[in-house]
A protein has these predicted regions:
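Rhodanese-like catalytic fold shared by cysteine-dependent sulfurtransferases
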Residues: 1-17, 21-54, 63-93
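Short, surface-exposed ligand- or partner-binding patches at beta-edge/loop junctions that are enriched
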Residues: 58
Length: 93
């Protein structure tokens, strides 16, 4: 599975195709933009994603986004996980 560090994510955020898989409540606390499909809905809404796009997937701590990346990859969609998730991103200086 591909991954990107929180620092690389911060430096390249505007150029990435972000897929935020956090719950609506979690996202309301801190919205990074991008596409929002909660992990629980990912399989039923996967058709909303472009198969030719590489997505950078984020959750709160990087655990659920690993699961999402595996699901996306199994469906032929390129995905990379943000290591440590939003928690790691927010801890950066």
């Amino acid at each position: 599975m591909l991954s990107i560090s929180a620092n690389e994510f911060k430096e390249n955020l505007s150029a990435l195709s972000l897929l935020d898989i956090r719950t609506p409540r979690e996202r309301a606390d801190f919205d990074l933009g991008g596409i929002h499909i909660p992990l629980d809905d990912l399989l039923t809404r996967i058709h909303e994603l472009n198969i030719s796009t590489k997505y950078t997937v984020i959750c709160y701590n990087g655990t659920q986004s690993q699961i999402a990346c595996r699901l996306l990859t199994a469906k032929g969609i390129q995905a990379q996980n943000v290591t440590g998730g939003l928690e790691a991103y927010l801890s950066l200086p």
